[in-house]
UniProtKB/Swiss-Prot annotation:
GO terms for molecular function: structural constituent of ribosome. Part of the 50S ribosomal subunit. This is Large ribosomal subunit protein bL31B. GO terms for cellular component: ribonucleoprotein complex; ribosome. One of its GO terms (biological process) is translation. It comes from Tropheryma whipplei (strain Twist) (Whipple's bacillus). Pfam families: Ribosomal_L31 (PF01197).
């Protein structure tokens, strides 16, 4: 491999904001936040809104994430059309 053309590949902690699960893995991401991991070392922290720990496909639980009332708007519109 050529030197100085590849991004630095290091350890990063990914935190799922929906379930508060954390995963230590490797990535080329460079987040500014840091966290102390179980082994006592400090690693960069990257926060994600959803991961395999909270996604309905992987958990088998169906949840509706509705922060702006879109589901209620849909139900109201559907109810008007069906009557």
């Amino acid at each position: 491999m050529k030197s100085d053309i590849h991004p630095e590949y290091g350890y990063v902690v990914f935190k799922d904001l929906a379930s508060s699960e954390m995963f230590l893995t490797r990535s080329v991401l460079k987040p500014e936040k840091q966290i102390e991991w179980n082994d006592g070392n400090h690693y960069p922290l990257f926060e994600v809104e959803i991961s395999s720990a909270s996604h309905p496909f992987y958990t088998g639980q169906q949840r509706i994430l509705d922060s702006e009332g879109r589901v209620e708007k849909f139900y109201a519109r559907y109810k008007k059309q069906s009557q």
